[in-house]
């Protein structure tokens, strides 16, 4: 990919995610590491990580049309309790996904497929913005930090979780590779 240069902090993660067919490019030559990750993209990655199991049944979300590239992934994730919609009938597939939403989804994925790896929890006091983690995501963030799925980003001599921030494709590739190392 033209946008993924050797030596970039995300280079190895993007290479591994692409090589293992967990993430795809935005085109044949562009990965777009700085582009925001959407809810549909993340669910597709996890569906691939699970081996792209076949699905059947009724889609609960009216904004996920049959035939879209993410349809099977959303149906699979919904049926397995890995994702919830923005409402009972809306998934918002093109909505950017935040870092705390990502760790919540990875935590649910782990509870479903590797429940033995859900017991640890870390304190978040080492992160300057730990108070900004939403209450609903607090246990998931503690889990992600304990298992080093998320390490935080350094700035001004402090570490930040940036839980409300939209995740980039490079960040998700990195989180994915750290998750696979569990």
What are these regions (language model features)?
Residues 1-9, 24-43, 47-73, 80-100, ...:
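Feature responds to low-complexity, polar/acidic, surface-exposed segments characteristic
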Residues 12-14:
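Thiotemplate assembly-line natural product biosynthesis machinery
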Residues 103:
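IQ-motif-like calmodulin-binding regions
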Residues 147-149:
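Short, charged, amphipathic alpha-helices and their helix-cap/turn boundaries
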